Design a protein with these regions (language model features):
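Conserved RNA-binding domains used in RNP assembly and mRNA/RNA metabolism
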Residues: 1-69
Length: 69
């Protein structure tokens, strides 16, 4: 199913595992729990990766939309 808007894509991904790339070069991989109109997201069972390598595991993370690429 194709999405016309970014929020539609996020809504379709709710409850699924996603990767979020951050401006600082890190990637967060986790299950999308919630989001808002500013693209702030809440992820569960998060893994933080740097250059593809696992750095650490984080339980739940709130990610500000302005830090996401």
């Amino acid at each position: 199913m194709e999405s016309d808007r970014p929020l539609d894509a996020l809504n379709n991904a709710r409850g699924k595992k996603i990767m979020v790339e951050l401006k600082n070069g890190k990637q967060l991989i986790g299950k999308l729990k919630a989001f808002d109109i500013h693209i702030n997201v809440v992820l569960e069972d998060v893994e933080e990766r740097v250059e593809g390598n696992l750095k650490r595991k984080i339980g739940t993370a709130f990610v500000r939309g302005d830090t996401i690429i």
